[in-house]
């Protein structure tokens, strides 16, 4: 897996315990995974359909640098499934891994449409 995006954890990214807020991390993951999928399909009209079980393995605090990576799992007729991992850049410790994030190509009416990639 290639780690392409990095984020510096700032105070506004934290929860009440002083660690990275999970909702913020999921927002970043969805954005990173969407960009990765758009680059695979060369198609911008996609939506997030599903994410598999989400387990937070460790956390991050102010000043930590995290990095996010995605890799292709499979192509469907209208969908693409990828996995994503977020880890601490310095320690390489996994913070979260999502094994399956499913994106679907949609037409102008929001209906699934073939993305045209056959693999």
Which residues make up each language-model segment?
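HotDog/MaoC-like acyl-thioester-processing domains
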Residues: 1-4, 56, 61-62, 73-119
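Hot-dog-fold acyl-thioester-processing enzymes
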Residues: 1-50, 104-119
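Short alpha-helix capping/helix-loop boundary micro-motifs
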Residues: 51-55
